[in-house]
Amino acid sequence: MLNKLTSLLKDAGISLTDHQKNQLIAYVNMLHKWNKAYNLTSVRDPNEMLVRHILDSIVVAPYLQGERFIDVGTGPGLPGIPLSIVRPEAHFTLLDSLGKRVRFLRQVQHELKLENIEPVQSRVEEFPSEPPFDGVISRAFASLNDMVSWCHHLPGEQGRFYALKGQMPEDEIALLPEEYQVESVVKLQVPALDGERHLVVIKANKI
C-alpha cells in the first residue's frame, strides 16, 4: 500500500515525509478494520480508500488559509484526519453528531498520536464558535446554502467556508444569500479518481 500511496502522491505533485505516509496508511488500515463493524464508509477496499478518501482530501491542503479549522459532518474523519496529517502545524476540530464516529476518531487520535485534532460529538448548530475559526470545511455535508446557514457563527472575521464538491455546483452557488460571496472555485486534480472534484471557497461579507 505504501508503494501505491507514494505513486499517487507523485502524480499529484505532493511531497510528504515517510512519517506522514505511514500515518495515512495507518489511518486507512484503522478505517478498513472498524468499517466492518461500524459501517463508517461505503468504500470497502483499502486501495480505493487511498484515492477516494486520502488523495481526495489532501489535495485541498494548499488552499486552506489560517491555522484553526473545523470539519463539520466529518464522519470517519474526512477530510479532517488526512488534512491534520499533512498540515501538522494547523489545528482541526472534527465535528460529528454520531457517537460511533466520534469514538472511532478518538481511537485514531490515540493510535496515531495526533495532537492537532479534537473530535467532538455535537450538532453543528449547537457548537460554540469561541474562539472563531479560520476555516469551516465540509465534504458531502450539505448544500452550500445549508452549510453557510448552519455554520454562519463559526468563522472569524477573515474566516472562510471550504466546501468540497463533485461537479461544479452552479445551482447551489446561485442560491447563496447575498451576504456571502464565492471567493474562488478550484478544479481539483485527484489522480486515479473518476469524476470531477471542485473546492468552493466562500467568504462572509462581515463588516
UniProtKB/Swiss-Prot annotation:
Classification via InterPro entries: rRNA_ssu_MeTfrase_G, SAM-dependent_MTases_sf
Gene3D superfamilies, per database record: Vaccinia Virus protein VP39
Enzyme Commission number(s) from the entry: 2.1.1.170
Similarity comment text for this entry: Belongs to the methyltransferase superfamily. RNA methyltransferase RsmG family.
Positions contributing to S-adenosyl-L-methionine binding: G73, L78, V124, E125, R139
Species in which this protein is naturally found: Escherichia coli O17:K52:H18 (strain UMN026 / ExPEC)
Top-level taxon: Bacteria
Subcellular location: Cytoplasm
Keyword vocabulary terms for this entry: Cytoplasm, Methyltransferase, rRNA processing, S-adenosyl-L-methionine, Transferase
Source lineage: Bacteria, Pseudomonadati, Pseudomonadota, Gammaproteobacteria, Enterobacterales
Gene Ontology MF annotations: rRNA (guanine-N7-)-methyltransferase activity
UniProt-recorded name of the protein: Ribosomal RNA small subunit methyltransferase G
Reactions catalysed, as given in the entry: guanosine(527) in 16S rRNA + S-adenosyl-L-methionine = N(7)-methylguanosine(527) in 16S rRNA + S-adenosyl-L-homocysteine
Enzyme kind, highest EC tier: transferase
GO cellular component terms, A-Z: cytosol
NCBIfam families, per the entry: rsmG_gidB (TIGR00138)
CDD domains in the record: AdoMet_MTases (cd02440)
Its job: Specifically methylates the N7 position of guanine in position 527 of 16S rRNA.
Main location: cytoplasm
